[in-house]
Amino acid sequence: MPSCCLEDIIGDTMHHPVEIVEVAPRDGFQSIAAPIPTKAKIEIIEGLIDAGLRRLEIGSFVSPRAVPQMADMPDIARHFRSDSRARLSVLVPNAKGAEMAMTHGLREIVYVFSVSEAHNQNNVRQSVQQSIDGLANVVSAISNEPDFRIRVDLATAFDCPFDGAVPFDAVRAAIERVTDLAPACEIALCDTTGRATPFAVQERMRAVQRLAVPPSCTWAFHGHDTYGMGVANAFAAYQAGIGVLDVAAAGLGGCPFAPGATGNTATEDLVYAFLNSGSSTGIDMGSLLLVADRIAAIPDAKVASHLRNVPRAAMQERMRQP
Protein backbone atom coordinates (compact mmCIF):
# COMPACT_ATOMS: atom_id res chain seq x y z
CA MET A 1 0.00 0.00 0.00
CA PRO A 2 1.58 3.34 -0.97
CA SER A 3 2.47 5.63 1.88
CA CYS A 4 0.93 9.07 2.13
CA CYS A 5 1.39 12.14 4.26
CA LEU A 6 -0.89 14.94 5.41
CA GLU A 7 0.07 17.07 2.43
CA ASP A 8 -0.99 14.30 0.04
CA ILE A 9 -4.42 14.30 1.66
CA ILE A 10 -5.09 18.03 1.93
CA GLY A 11 -3.04 19.33 -0.98
CA ASP A 12 -1.59 22.77 -1.54
CA THR A 13 -4.66 24.54 -0.16
CA MET A 14 -3.13 24.10 3.29
CA HIS A 15 -0.58 26.82 2.66
CA HIS A 16 -2.63 29.95 2.10
CA PRO A 17 -2.84 32.64 4.83
CA VAL A 18 -5.30 32.30 7.70
CA GLU A 19 -7.03 35.22 9.39
CA ILE A 20 -8.74 34.55 12.71
CA VAL A 21 -11.75 36.75 13.57
CA GLU A 22 -12.52 36.91 17.29
CA VAL A 23 -16.26 37.27 17.99
CA ALA A 24 -16.53 36.61 21.74
CA PRO A 25 -16.96 40.31 22.65
CA ARG A 26 -20.11 40.41 20.51
CA ASP A 27 -21.47 36.96 19.72
CA GLY A 28 -20.27 35.63 23.06
CA PHE A 29 -21.12 38.43 25.48
CA GLN A 30 -24.66 38.76 24.12
CA SER A 31 -25.37 35.21 25.31
CA ILE A 32 -24.93 36.26 28.95
CA ALA A 33 -28.02 37.79 30.55
CA ALA A 34 -26.46 39.57 33.53
CA PRO A 35 -24.65 42.81 32.63
CA ILE A 36 -20.88 42.41 32.28
CA PRO A 37 -19.08 45.48 33.65
CA THR A 38 -17.85 47.72 30.84
CA LYS A 39 -14.38 47.79 32.38
CA ALA A 40 -14.22 43.98 32.26
CA LYS A 41 -15.31 43.93 28.61
CA ILE A 42 -12.63 46.45 27.67
CA GLU A 43 -9.96 44.51 29.57
CA ILE A 44 -10.94 41.28 27.81
CA ILE A 45 -10.80 42.94 24.39
CA GLU A 46 -7.42 44.45 25.29
CA GLY A 47 -6.21 41.02 26.36
CA LEU A 48 -7.31 39.46 23.09
CA ILE A 49 -5.48 42.12 21.10
CA ASP A 50 -2.39 41.67 23.27
CA ALA A 51 -2.57 37.91 22.58
CA GLY A 52 -2.23 38.62 18.86
CA LEU A 53 -5.81 38.78 17.57
CA ARG A 54 -5.90 41.26 14.70
CA ARG A 55 -9.60 41.14 13.81
CA LEU A 56 -12.31 41.41 16.44
CA GLU A 57 -16.05 42.02 16.61
CA ILE A 58 -16.20 44.18 19.71
CA GLY A 59 -19.99 44.47 20.07
CA SER A 60 -23.10 45.72 18.35
CA PHE A 61 -25.01 48.96 17.99
CA VAL A 62 -28.46 47.52 18.62
CA SER A 63 -31.42 48.56 20.72
CA PRO A 64 -30.56 48.16 24.42
CA ARG A 65 -34.09 46.87 24.91
CA ALA A 66 -33.44 44.06 22.44
CA VAL A 67 -29.92 43.21 23.66
CA PRO A 68 -29.31 44.85 27.07
CA GLN A 69 -25.75 43.46 27.18
CA MET A 70 -24.79 45.86 24.37
CA ALA A 71 -26.12 49.02 26.06
CA ASP A 72 -22.55 50.16 26.80
CA MET A 73 -21.40 49.89 23.18
CA PRO A 74 -20.79 53.67 22.88
CA ASP A 75 -18.38 53.54 25.84
CA ILE A 76 -16.50 50.56 24.41
CA ALA A 77 -16.31 52.16 20.97
CA ARG A 78 -15.05 55.38 22.52
CA HIS A 79 -12.24 53.51 24.29
CA PHE A 80 -11.03 51.87 21.06
CA ARG A 81 -11.74 54.80 18.75
CA SER A 82 -8.10 55.53 17.88
CA ASP A 83 -6.78 51.98 18.27
CA SER A 84 -4.85 50.90 15.19
CA ARG A 85 -3.52 47.57 16.50
CA ALA A 86 -6.39 45.55 15.06
CA ARG A 87 -9.38 45.69 12.72
CA LEU A 88 -12.35 46.30 14.99
CA SER A 89 -15.90 45.81 13.74
CA VAL A 90 -19.40 46.07 15.17
CA LEU A 91 -22.64 44.41 14.21
CA VAL A 92 -25.39 46.77 13.07
CA PRO A 93 -29.05 45.85 12.38
CA ASN A 94 -29.92 48.89 10.30
CA ALA A 95 -28.76 52.24 8.89
CA LYS A 96 -29.06 53.90 12.30
CA GLY A 97 -26.59 51.39 13.72
CA ALA A 98 -24.21 52.07 10.82
CA GLU A 99 -24.43 55.80 11.50
CA MET A 100 -23.68 55.23 15.18
CA ALA A 101 -20.63 53.17 14.23
CA MET A 102 -19.36 55.99 12.02
CA THR A 103 -20.08 58.59 14.71
CA HIS A 104 -17.92 56.63 17.13
CA GLY A 105 -15.01 56.36 14.70
CA LEU A 106 -15.35 52.72 13.71
CA ARG A 107 -14.56 51.81 10.11
CA GLU A 108 -16.02 48.32 9.78
CA ILE A 109 -19.52 46.95 10.27
CA VAL A 110 -21.22 43.57 10.12
CA TYR A 111 -24.78 43.09 8.87
CA VAL A 112 -26.60 39.80 9.40
CA PHE A 113 -29.62 38.17 7.85
CA SER A 114 -30.73 34.59 7.41
CA VAL A 115 -31.00 32.65 4.18
CA SER A 116 -33.95 30.84 5.75
CA GLU A 117 -37.25 32.74 5.93
CA ALA A 118 -38.29 30.93 9.11
CA HIS A 119 -35.08 31.75 10.96
CA ASN A 120 -35.01 35.35 9.76
CA GLN A 121 -38.53 35.86 11.07
CA ASN A 122 -37.59 34.25 14.38
CA ASN A 123 -34.32 36.17 14.66
CA VAL A 124 -35.14 39.71 13.50
CA ARG A 125 -38.93 39.58 12.90
CA GLN A 126 -38.48 40.41 9.23
CA SER A 127 -38.78 38.63 5.92
CA VAL A 128 -35.57 38.01 4.01
CA GLN A 129 -36.64 40.68 1.52
CA GLN A 130 -37.10 43.21 4.32
CA SER A 131 -33.60 42.41 5.60
CA ILE A 132 -32.17 42.88 2.12
CA ASP A 133 -33.96 46.23 1.93
CA GLY A 134 -32.33 47.04 5.27
CA LEU A 135 -28.93 46.17 3.81
CA ALA A 136 -29.59 48.61 0.97
CA ASN A 137 -30.21 51.33 3.54
CA VAL A 138 -27.00 50.45 5.39
CA VAL A 139 -24.99 50.57 2.17
CA SER A 140 -26.51 53.96 1.37
CA ALA A 141 -25.62 55.26 4.84
CA ILE A 142 -21.93 54.44 4.40
CA SER A 143 -21.68 55.25 0.69
CA ASN A 144 -19.82 58.52 1.21
CA GLU A 145 -17.35 57.10 3.72
CA PRO A 146 -13.95 56.29 2.15
CA ASP A 147 -12.20 53.08 3.17
CA PHE A 148 -15.23 51.83 5.08
CA ARG A 149 -15.62 48.04 5.23
CA ILE A 150 -18.82 46.05 5.33
CA ARG A 151 -19.26 42.36 5.97
CA VAL A 152 -22.50 40.43 5.50
CA ASP A 153 -23.07 37.30 7.57
CA LEU A 154 -25.48 34.85 5.95
CA ALA A 155 -27.02 32.94 8.84
CA THR A 156 -28.44 29.45 8.22
CA ALA A 157 -26.28 29.09 5.11
CA PHE A 158 -26.18 25.32 5.66
CA ASP A 159 -29.04 24.37 7.93
CA CYS A 160 -32.09 25.96 9.58
CA PRO A 161 -33.32 24.93 13.06
CA PHE A 162 -36.91 25.14 11.80
CA ASP A 163 -36.77 24.03 8.15
CA GLY A 164 -33.75 21.71 8.09
CA ALA A 165 -31.18 21.62 5.28
CA VAL A 166 -30.90 24.87 3.30
CA PRO A 167 -30.53 24.35 -0.48
CA PHE A 168 -27.58 25.91 -2.26
CA ASP A 169 -29.92 27.74 -4.63
CA ALA A 170 -31.20 29.78 -1.69
CA VAL A 171 -27.64 30.63 -0.64
CA ARG A 172 -26.74 31.60 -4.19
CA ALA A 173 -29.79 33.85 -4.46
CA ALA A 174 -28.87 35.61 -1.22
CA ILE A 175 -25.28 36.12 -2.38
CA GLU A 176 -26.47 37.60 -5.67
CA ARG A 177 -28.66 40.10 -3.82
CA VAL A 178 -25.83 41.04 -1.47
CA THR A 179 -23.23 41.56 -4.18
CA ASP A 180 -25.65 43.64 -6.22
CA LEU A 181 -25.83 46.05 -3.28
CA ALA A 182 -22.30 45.77 -1.87
CA PRO A 183 -19.87 44.38 -4.47
CA ALA A 184 -16.83 45.00 -2.27
CA CYS A 185 -18.11 43.26 0.85
CA GLU A 186 -16.90 40.20 2.72
CA ILE A 187 -19.55 37.48 2.87
CA ALA A 188 -19.51 34.93 5.69
CA LEU A 189 -21.40 31.67 5.41
CA CYS A 190 -22.62 30.75 8.88
CA ASP A 191 -23.32 27.26 10.18
CA THR A 192 -25.87 28.65 12.62
CA THR A 193 -27.04 25.33 14.05
CA GLY A 194 -23.64 23.65 14.08
CA ARG A 195 -25.12 20.68 12.22
CA ALA A 196 -23.00 20.99 9.08
CA THR A 197 -20.34 18.34 8.45
CA PRO A 198 -16.81 19.01 7.18
CA PHE A 199 -17.74 17.52 3.80
CA ALA A 200 -20.79 19.78 3.49
CA VAL A 201 -18.75 22.83 4.51
CA GLN A 202 -15.98 22.10 2.05
CA GLU A 203 -18.42 21.48 -0.80
CA ARG A 204 -20.43 24.66 -0.15
CA MET A 205 -17.42 26.91 0.39
CA ARG A 206 -15.93 25.68 -2.88
CA ALA A 207 -19.25 26.22 -4.63
CA VAL A 208 -19.59 29.86 -3.58
CA GLN A 209 -16.10 30.59 -4.86
CA ARG A 210 -17.20 29.39 -8.29
CA LEU A 211 -20.03 31.92 -8.45
CA ALA A 212 -19.76 34.91 -10.77
CA VAL A 213 -19.32 37.58 -8.10
CA PRO A 214 -17.32 40.83 -8.30
CA PRO A 215 -13.58 40.26 -7.75
CA SER A 216 -13.72 42.61 -4.75
CA CYS A 217 -16.06 40.20 -2.92
CA THR A 218 -14.29 37.97 -0.37
CA TRP A 219 -15.37 35.03 1.76
CA ALA A 220 -15.40 33.91 5.40
CA PHE A 221 -16.75 31.02 7.47
CA HIS A 222 -18.51 31.17 10.84
CA GLY A 223 -19.09 27.82 12.52
CA HIS A 224 -20.44 26.46 15.78
CA ASP A 225 -19.20 23.52 17.84
CA THR A 226 -22.66 22.28 18.84
CA TYR A 227 -22.05 18.83 17.34
CA GLY A 228 -18.31 18.81 18.03
CA MET A 229 -17.50 19.76 14.43
CA GLY A 230 -16.29 23.33 15.03
CA VAL A 231 -12.57 22.88 14.37
CA ALA A 232 -13.11 20.23 11.69
CA ASN A 233 -15.56 22.48 9.83
CA ALA A 234 -13.25 25.50 10.07
CA PHE A 235 -10.43 23.37 8.66
CA ALA A 236 -12.71 22.13 5.89
CA ALA A 237 -13.47 25.74 4.94
CA TYR A 238 -9.75 26.53 5.05
CA GLN A 239 -8.94 23.56 2.83
CA ALA A 240 -11.58 24.84 0.41
CA GLY A 241 -9.61 28.07 0.11
CA ILE A 242 -11.30 30.22 2.77
CA GLY A 243 -8.76 32.16 4.83
CA VAL A 244 -11.08 34.09 7.18
CA LEU A 245 -12.45 32.01 10.07
CA ASP A 246 -14.62 33.15 13.00
CA VAL A 247 -14.04 31.88 16.52
CA ALA A 248 -14.75 32.91 20.12
CA ALA A 249 -12.31 32.67 23.00
CA ALA A 250 -13.34 29.91 25.44
CA GLY A 251 -16.02 28.87 22.93
CA LEU A 252 -18.36 31.45 24.45
CA GLY A 253 -21.79 31.97 22.96
CA GLY A 254 -23.82 30.64 20.08
CA CYS A 255 -27.03 31.72 18.41
CA PRO A 256 -29.76 32.66 20.93
CA PHE A 257 -32.37 32.44 18.16
CA ALA A 258 -31.44 28.92 17.03
CA PRO A 259 -32.71 26.37 19.56
CA GLY A 260 -29.90 24.10 20.72
CA ALA A 261 -27.15 25.90 18.80
CA THR A 262 -24.85 26.56 21.72
CA GLY A 263 -21.11 26.90 21.52
CA ASN A 264 -19.01 28.92 19.15
CA THR A 265 -15.78 27.28 18.03
CA ALA A 266 -13.14 28.08 20.64
CA THR A 267 -10.33 30.34 19.45
CA GLU A 268 -7.73 28.37 21.37
CA ASP A 269 -8.87 25.06 19.85
CA LEU A 270 -8.53 26.37 16.29
CA VAL A 271 -5.21 28.10 16.98
CA TYR A 272 -3.85 24.80 18.31
CA ALA A 273 -5.12 22.98 15.22
CA PHE A 274 -3.02 25.28 13.03
CA LEU A 275 0.24 24.29 14.73
CA ASN A 276 2.73 22.91 12.19
CA SER A 277 0.37 23.77 9.32
CA GLY A 278 2.72 26.21 7.64
CA SER A 279 0.19 29.00 8.19
CA SER A 280 0.80 31.09 11.30
CA THR A 281 -2.11 32.63 13.19
CA GLY A 282 0.22 35.05 14.98
CA ILE A 283 -1.58 34.34 18.26
CA ASP A 284 0.23 33.58 21.53
CA MET A 285 -1.45 30.55 23.08
CA GLY A 286 -0.42 31.26 26.67
CA SER A 287 -1.82 34.78 26.58
CA LEU A 288 -4.96 33.62 24.79
CA LEU A 289 -5.67 30.94 27.39
CA LEU A 290 -5.42 33.48 30.20
CA VAL A 291 -8.08 35.60 28.49
CA ALA A 292 -10.20 32.50 27.85
CA ASP A 293 -9.98 31.65 31.55
CA ARG A 294 -11.21 35.11 32.44
CA ILE A 295 -14.12 34.78 30.02
CA ALA A 296 -15.03 31.37 31.44
CA ALA A 297 -15.12 32.90 34.93
CA ILE A 298 -17.88 35.38 33.98
CA PRO A 299 -21.05 34.38 35.87
CA ASP A 300 -23.44 32.35 33.67
CA ALA A 301 -20.90 32.11 30.84
CA LYS A 302 -21.49 28.95 28.82
CA VAL A 303 -18.15 27.94 27.34
CA ALA A 304 -17.08 25.03 25.15
CA SER A 305 -13.29 24.90 24.98
CA HIS A 306 -11.32 21.67 24.82
CA LEU A 307 -7.86 23.15 25.24
CA ARG A 308 -8.70 24.86 28.52
CA ASN A 309 -9.17 21.39 30.02
CA VAL A 310 -5.63 20.29 29.15
CA PRO A 311 -3.14 20.71 32.03
CA ARG A 312 -1.13 23.84 31.33
CA ALA A 313 2.21 22.12 31.90
CA ALA A 314 1.39 19.58 29.21
CA MET A 315 0.21 22.36 26.92
CA GLN A 316 3.41 24.36 27.41
CA GLU A 317 5.50 21.28 26.67
CA ARG A 318 3.54 20.64 23.46
CA MET A 319 3.91 24.25 22.34
CA ARG A 320 7.69 23.96 22.68
CA GLN A 321 7.83 21.00 20.32
CA PRO A 322 8.64 21.68 16.65
Where are these regions (language model features)?
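Catalytic cores and adjacent flexible loops of soluble metabolic enzymes
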Residues: 2-322
